[in-house]
Amino acid sequence: VDHPGVDGITFTGSYRVGMEIYAKVAGGRRPRPVITEMGGKNPTIVARSADLDLAAEGVARAAFGLSGQKCSACSRVYVHADVKEAFAAKLAAQAGKVQIGDPTQQEYWMGPVINRRAYEAYRAHVAELRTQGNILTGGATLDPRGFYVAPTVVADLPENHPLWKQELFLPIVLVTSFTDFDEALAKANDVDFGLTAGCYSEDPGEVAKFLDTIEAGVIYVNRHTSATTGAWPGYQPFGGWKGSSNTNKGAGGAYYLQQYMREQSQTIVRQGRGWEEDEERGELSE
């Protein structure tokens, strides 16, 4: 960051390190562009009108893909009280279908967590969740030959618990209920991050309110073919709001490339015979 030959910085990682980079650049000799992607605590809202099978599949893909070790993982779900039990059962069933094993083999969908530190963090969180919430499925370590853990769905964790706002980077998703859609939006926005978010609803008014109100850089409605919170960087900008990013083009695709380019306004004032001769030879054109 301090090297005079560095014209710009791109960083993907923790909020703490990202903010340290900003501070160093701000205290430097000259301004330089900084592109960051500093994580997320990504919510999904499941409305009363939602297709629950669609929602359960989309949330499972978002929560457990790459063992939850992605900044766009869905880690909290707000479900209308009238359909909470039905949705939670469907999500737990989706988690139970996940094939866990060597991720280099095609038959396995979820591999191990990255290292012992993550493995021990999973164990510690699960131990606390057993006493504070209701583990619907998962909560177990698996093959002792690797850092394999079970995809975990948790209900009834008090909403003032720190895990509602802490990025876990683990295959753990929390589920709670709401009775008013505005209440769900307020809860979804009540974190320091704003990377991705998802919503399942067949009510056009709710969908419009979600799109207008949610504080996240990448949002999806009724998505199930891939994760309901996720990234599609080859096709659209990927970045976040608040503590997730300083730009909505944090990674991927042509939008990302634009941030490595510099603008320059160029003006030529034509005077004298030389310009006319160049035009006649075709060496200068508009």
Q: Residue ranges of each PLM-predicted region?
A:
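Conserved C-terminal structural/oligomerization subdomain of aldehyde/semialdehyde dehydrogenase
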Residues: 3-6, 45, 99-103, 110-111, ...
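ALDH superfamily catalytic-core signature
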Residues: 4, 8, 16-158, 181-182, ...
